[in-house]
Amino acid sequence: MKKFKYSFILVFILLFNIKDLTYAQGDIGVGNLRNFYTKHDYIDLKGVTDKNLPIANQLEFSTGTNDLISESNNWDEISKFKGKKLDIFGIDYNGPCKSKYMYGGATLSGQYLNSARKIPINLWVNGKHKTISTDKIATNKKLVTAQEIDVKLRRYLQEEYNIYGHNNTGKGKEYGYKSKFYSGFNNGKVLFHLNNEKSFSYVLFYTGDGLPVSFLKIYEDNKIIESEKFHLDVEISYVDSN
């Protein structure tokens, strides 16, 4: 009887620890998503030259104290960028040997509009619609990565609606703090509605395995779009999972 009792206690402890580990990993994802998208300084480089190294899926640049390596699974696109002057925009994370890594974020340098275009946005907040046009989500590039627009959008949503919690603007308090992000939201997506191509979307609250190397991988294809031929449809809401 004692043996059975001790076995039961051991199983209970193991299950409890697994639950705690999962919860902790979830917390890591929440914190990392908030920090990397809204507090981390993003990469914004103009006219930097790729080192033209023989690694098919990587671009590499010198940025002073660190090398910056951009990885992509779009080998055809990357091959066109080898040795060229590029503009780089995106979120980096720490890699081995003091290098900074990121996914995609590359466009050819020198292809600019006469003036920056504010990206038109349809925004639904808990089902209520409004339109947005702001300098904070704009670009002067003729061809821009989806990553650049998505990063700027998320930072704007954090500042105005506190989607990831703990913003420093004081805005968004009216939506409460009921989600695990300590905000009023846990569900949402951004749809890139292209004029002449198939639309695509990103989930705004996707945390992957909790680490940036995982949740930033959505930009691995270095998706590039014509900046004058799309708008955004954005939805944010709260979904009770109970």
Stretches with model-predicted labels:
Residues 33, 78-81, 86, 121, ...:
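Extended hydrophobic/Leu-rich segments
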Residues 57, 62-82, 109, 113-202:
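Mature extracytoplasmic domains of secretory-pathway proteins
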Residues 6, 23, 37-42, 93, ...:
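Sequence-level detector for tyrosine residue identity
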